[in-house]
Each structure stands twice: as structure tokens, then as C-alpha cells.
């Protein structure tokens, strides 16, 4: 894409800023993802125009200096940032001003110039500013070249579109700006104030007028409180106590040298401040989410069938998911639901697809498109919706994809099992015939034998009961006692006390009925759900088998009295001697 192919661009670089960056480029006709390096080819070709128009640089700067500057450090660094690279390319693709270009046969050549970072900032699309800011801190030897590129852009453009970090696309389809009456944010050093929604202008003001760069502004949860904090701190101590200093024009005379200051989370105080702001923001989000959970005054209209819903927000969300297959997530994972639904409704009112965001001529065409293309859903890569999901507020600087992709198995493996807080509770098994409880099963067996003349261990041994038969027998006795019925004579009594008196007087506790009476499938189910006695029963069959194996298997000890004679008469020893004689 040559510079002459771009339509609608001013020729004068002072009016355009950078030639080949903005213009009336048509929207792509296909819906597939463009290749990453196709976009890099576009970036590189447009970035070359920066080199063509460096004649307007400040005094003492030559275009040859920029053209000859080494980009190897930048290239190596960016090759290691392939993930950030692909993310930026996806963002560029979603911008409606870009179109597909031929694939370059040598894609890595587009990494040889640092100017493409500046171009990405100027395009106004979402881009990972962290790359540019890390470059400032890591590439000290290239800092002069890097800041000369910045200066070239600032001095070359009189437009107000030149900003420090990437622009965000409008949050609403109409492209409206900030609400009137939004709080203003002061400059860190002077009395200039800017509306909260125009923080880009404040950042531009601070870097031009005061030569200070704030790293990773997008990761600051509360920008206004962040600025107010450092405004106070800079009045207490010099800026050099907090910021890294980068000197440009180092070879020029001293009066022409400039110092730029980088404020980033490498400073522990800045890191702590960002984390505290993030925690405060998370608390506000969770409080808002809890209010929405308990809110019963919600009123909303379905975006697809115009049916009205009142009560809790979950009623409307569940309706759209069930009836229209439009699922934006669980209600408990969403915050600011009313604003979220309003944003989606405005897109549909503007005849815009919720997934690919194409605009159609009428509502029927839009409905057919969303149905056939299965676009009745939101695009998870659209960062516009991130602020409506709680997961994006959990960790500082991490998106929902990064949080979900983390593998916690390694962390679980590294954690040692800690049993220091383990408390051993007594068994508290209950007698079969009365309410007596014992802490050990042995004591309970003794109690039933002495008090009720019921020897469960003897019965188990005489009848050869396995574990499952013991379970049936215990459950059978429990049920009969619960029904106040004697299992031997089948007489029913008014109370358990009368039943115990009868069974003890008649010695019926030890007179079990026939096996077919209690050895039934129905007695697999416990009479009492918390019957601890069932958990202490042993498998007599396995115990007996193990005991028989121990008794029947003979153990023959090794005879070591004739060990020397065995060695001399062994076949192996004879073969070895025969081999030696033959050799």
C-alpha cells in the first residue's frame, strides 16, 4: 500500500502528522481474521512515510540519523513479545479504517523499525502501550533515537489527535464523549485541569510541558486518585527520588540536552499505590454486584421479542438465554447490568451486529445475518464489554483470558499438606437397643454384651457374616427397634422402653429370626443416616481369608550351614572352571 494509494490524506505532513496513517480506507469485505504479518506489512509501509518526512525535525536532527539508527535491539525484544504482537494485530484488524493487504514474504523485516510503535499509537486503535514504555526503560542506548521519533511527531502536527497512549474506541455506538459534569483531573505539576474523560490530553500535556511519562496508564484503576497522590508527593520530594531519568541529545551541548522522567510500578511505592487502588475498585464493583443481585426493582425489555420483565435482572437474562439462545454469561458474573443491556440495545437500534459490528440497511437483514452466521452473541475479544464482567477486576493487569488460562495445578502440587489443625473427634456409636453412646466401638460391643446379652462379634463369627450381611443385620435391628417391634416374636409395643424390658426378660435379643427375614436388599439402606456403627463394621470374609493364608503358607528359612559346599558344587561354578581350562 503505497502512500499515493491512500485516499483522503493531506499531502503536507504538518497537517497530517504522519502520512499514510489515517484516511478513507474502506471496511474489509470478508469476516475472517487477517494474518498478523499482513497487518504488519501495512504498519511497516506506513511507517516508512515517517522516515520520508523527517525533514521537519528540530534543529540538530537529521533524517539520516533516524534512517541509520539501529533497530536490532527493538527487533529482538519484539520477537520475544509475539503474544502482544498478535493482540495488537487483532485490534488493528477490528478497526474499520484498515483493509487487507498482500502478505509479505519476509514478515520479520517489519520488526526492524521502532517507528511502527509510534504508528500504532497514532492509529487510534487499541494497542499494548506496555511495549513502548518497556522499550523506554530497557533501551537506554536507543532512548535518544526513540524520543527523537516522538519529537518528530509532536513538532510535525498541529492537530489535537496526537496523544501519548492508544485511543479507545467510543464506548457507545454514537461516539459520544464524556458526560457533562464529570470530575476534572489536575496536572501533577501545574494548575491545568482536564475532564476525566480527556485523560489522554492530560498525558500529552505532562509529557510535552513537564517531560514525564506514566507507564501502563490503562492498569491504573482510579486515574484521578493516582494523579492526586503523586501531585502531593512531588511537592514533598524531588521528582528524581521517584522517577527514572532518561537523557536525550546526550551528544549535544548541555543546554540542549533534555531529561525525561518515567513513573512506573518498578518503584515499590507506585506498585503499592496501584494495588490499593485496584483493591478499592474491586470492592466497589463487588458492592455494586451485590446490590444488583438483591435488587427487585429491575425493569427491562427483551431485545429480541420486546417482552417486558420486572423483578430481578436474572429473569431477563435467563429469558434471552433460554428463548433466544443469547447468552452473555451468568447473572452473578455481570456487574452494571443495566448499562450493559443499554449498550447492546443501542447497537441493535443502530442496525449493528453484536458480534462482527457490521451495519445493515434494515432490521430484517440484521436478524437474518445474526441467525445464519450464528452472531447472536457478543465478541469475547471486544474489550468494550470487559468492564461489565467481574473477572476483569480480579487481578491487576490481567484480562479474563489470562486469568482463565492460568494453570493452578502446579501451585496445588507445591502446597504441602498441613494437618496441624486436624482434630480427632470421638466415634459416638449408639447402642442397637438403647440410647447409650460410647466413644469407641469396642466399648459399645462390651455394653451390648453385658447389658442386653447381644454379642455382635459372636453372631458374626458363628454365622460367617461378611460386611454386607452385617450391614443388613444392623439395619434390620435398627428398624425393628424403631418400630417398637420384637424381631423374635413379632410383638409390637407402645414404647422402646417396654420393648427393651420384654426382650431382656424373654432373652429375645440373642434370638435372631431366620436369615431370609433380614438378609434382604431393602436393608442395604440405613435406618439412620448418621449411624456410626455401620462405619466400624469389618469384613470378616477378608479377615478370615488373610488369616487362613497366613496359617496355610509355610515359611522355610534359608539353610546357611552348608553355604561353602553349595558354592563349590553349583553348576555355575563348574561352567566357569570349565571355561578357564579351555582357554
Curated annotation (Swiss-Prot):
ZnF endpoints (C2H2-type): 351-375, 482-508
UniProt entry keywords in alphabetical sequence: Chromosome, Cytoplasm, Metal-binding, Nucleus, Repeat, Transcription, Transcription regulation, Zinc, Zinc-finger
Entry's Gene Ontology molecular function annotations: RNA polymerase II cis-regulatory region sequence-specific DNA binding; zinc ion binding
Subcellular location: Nucleus; Cytoplasm; Nucleus, Nucleolus; Chromosome
Inducing stimuli: Down-regulated by oxidative stress.
Pfam families: zf-C2H2_2
Gene Ontology cellular-component annotations: chromosome; cytoplasm; nucleolus
Domain of life: Eukaryota
SMART domains associated with the record: ZnF_C2H2
GO BP of this protein: cellular response to hydrogen peroxide; regulation of cellular senescence
Chief site of localization: nucleus
PROSITE patterns: ZINC_FINGER_C2H2_1, ZINC_FINGER_C2H2_2
Subunit organization: Interacts (via zinc-finger domains) with RPS2/40S ribosomal protein S2, perhaps as nascent RPS2 is synthesized during translation; the interaction is direct; the interaction is extra-ribosomal. Interaction with RPS2 competes with the binding of RPS2 to protein arginine methyltransferase PRMT3. Interacts with Polycomb group (PcG) complex protein BMI1. May be part of a complex including at least ZNF277, BMI1 and RNF2/RING2.
Function: Probable transcription factor. Involved in modulation of cellular senescence; represses transcription of the tumor suppressor gene INK4A/ARF, perhaps acting via the Polycomb group (PcG) complex PRC1.
Homology family: Belongs to the ZNF277 family.
Protein name: Zinc finger protein 277
Species of the source: Mus musculus (Mouse)
Amino acid at each position: 500500500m503505497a502512500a499515493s494509494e491512500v485516499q483522503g490524506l493531506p499531502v503536507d505532513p504538518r497537517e497530517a502528522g504522519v502520512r499514510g496513517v489515517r484516511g478513507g480506507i474502506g471496511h474489509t469485505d470478508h469476516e475472517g481474521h487477517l494474518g498478523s504479518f499482513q497487518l504488519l506489512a501495512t504498519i511497516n509501509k506506513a511507517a516508512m512515510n515517517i522516515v520520508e518526512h523527517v525533514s521537519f525535525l528540530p534543529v540538530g536532527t537529521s533524517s539520516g540519523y533516524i534512517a541509520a539508527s539501529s533497530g536490532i535491539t527493538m527487533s529482538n525484544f519484539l520477537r520475544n513479545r509475539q503474544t502482544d504482537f498478535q493482540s495488537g494485530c487483532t485490534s488493528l484488524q477490528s478497526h474499520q479504517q484498515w483493509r487487507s493487504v498482500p502478505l509479505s514474504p519476509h514478515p520479520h523485516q517489519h520488526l526492524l523499525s521502532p517507528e511502527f510503535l509510534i504508528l500504532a499509537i497514532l492509529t487510534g486503535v487499541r494497542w499494548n502501550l506496555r511495549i513502548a514504555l518497556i522499550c523506554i526503560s530497557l533501551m537506554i542506548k536507543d532512548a535518544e533515537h526513540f524520543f527523537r521519533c516522538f519529537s518528530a511527531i509532536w513538532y510535525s502536527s498541529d492537530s489535537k489527535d496526537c496523544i501519548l497512549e492508544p485511543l479507545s474506541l467510543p464506548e457507545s455506538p454514537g461516539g459520544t464523549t464524556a458526560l457533562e459534569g464529570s470530575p476534572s483531573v489536575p496536572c501533577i505539576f501545574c494548575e491545568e485541569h482536564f475532564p476525566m474523560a480527556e485523560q489522554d490530553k492530560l498525558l500529552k500535556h505532562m509529557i510535552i510541558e513537564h517531560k514525564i511519562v506514566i507507564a501502563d496508564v490503562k492498569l491504573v484503576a482510579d486515574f484521578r486518585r493516582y494523579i492526586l497522590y503523586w501531585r502531593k508527593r512531588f511537592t514533598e520530594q524531588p521528582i528524581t527520588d521517584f522517577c527514572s531519568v532518561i537523557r536525550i541529545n546526550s551528544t549535544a551541548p548541555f543546554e540542549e540536552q533534555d531529561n525525561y522522567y518515567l513513573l512506573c510500578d518498578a518503584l515499590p511505592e507506585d506498585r503499592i499505590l496501584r494495588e490499593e487502588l485496584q483493591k478499592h475498585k474491586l470492592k466497589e464493583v463487588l458492592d455494586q454486584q451485590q446490590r444488583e443481585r438483591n435488587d427487585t426493582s429491575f425493569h427491562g425489555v427483551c431485545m429480541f421479542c420486546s417482552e417486558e420483565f420486572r423483578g430481578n435482572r436474572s429473569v431477563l437474562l435467563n429469558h434471552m438465554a433460554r428463548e433466544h439462545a443469547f447468552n452473555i454469561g451468568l447473572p452473578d458474573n455481570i456487574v452494571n447490568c443495566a448499562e450493559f443491556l443499554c449498550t447492546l440495545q443501542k447497537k441493535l437500534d443502530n442496525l449493528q451486529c453484536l458480534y462482527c459490528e457490521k451495519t445493515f440497511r434494515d432490521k430484517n437483514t440484521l436478524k437474518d445475518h445474526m441467525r445464519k452466521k450464528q452472531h447472536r452473541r457478543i465478541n469475547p475479544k471486544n474489550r468494550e464489554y470487559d468492564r461489565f464482567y467481574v473477572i476483569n477486576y480480579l487481578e491487576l493487569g490481567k484480562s479474563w483470558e489470562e486469568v482463565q488460562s492460568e494453570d493452578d495445578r502446579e501451585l496445588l502440587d507445591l502446597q504441602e499438606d498441613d494437618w496441624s489443625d486436624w482434630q480427632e473427634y470421638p466415634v459416638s456409636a449408639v447402642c442397637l437397643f438403647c440410647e447409650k453412646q460410647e466413644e469407641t466401638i469396642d466399648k459399645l460391643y462390651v455394653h451390648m454384651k453385658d447389658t442386653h446379652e447381644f454379642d455382635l462379634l459372636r453372631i458374626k463369627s458363628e454365622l460367617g457374616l461378611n460386611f454386607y450381611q452385617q450391614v443388613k443385620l444392623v439395619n434390620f435391628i435398627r428398624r425393628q427397634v424403631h418400630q417398637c417391634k420384637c424381631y423374635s416374636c413379632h410383638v409390637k409395643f407402645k414404647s422402646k422402653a417396654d420393648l427393651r424390658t420384654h426382650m431382656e426378660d424373654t432373652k429375645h435379643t440373642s434370638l435372631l429370626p431366620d436369615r431370609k427375614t433380614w438378609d434382604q436388599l431393602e436393608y442395604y439402606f440405613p435406618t439412620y443416616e448418621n449411624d456410626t456403627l455401620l462405619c466400624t463394621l469389618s469384613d470378616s470374609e477378608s479377615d478370615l481369608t488373610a488369616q487362613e493364608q497366613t496359617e496355610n503358607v509355610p515359611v522355610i528359612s534359608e539353610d546357611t550351614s552348608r553355604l561353602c559346599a553349595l558354592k563349590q558344587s553349583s553348576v555355575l561354578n563348574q561352567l566357569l572352571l570349565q571355561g578357564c581350562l579351555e582357554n
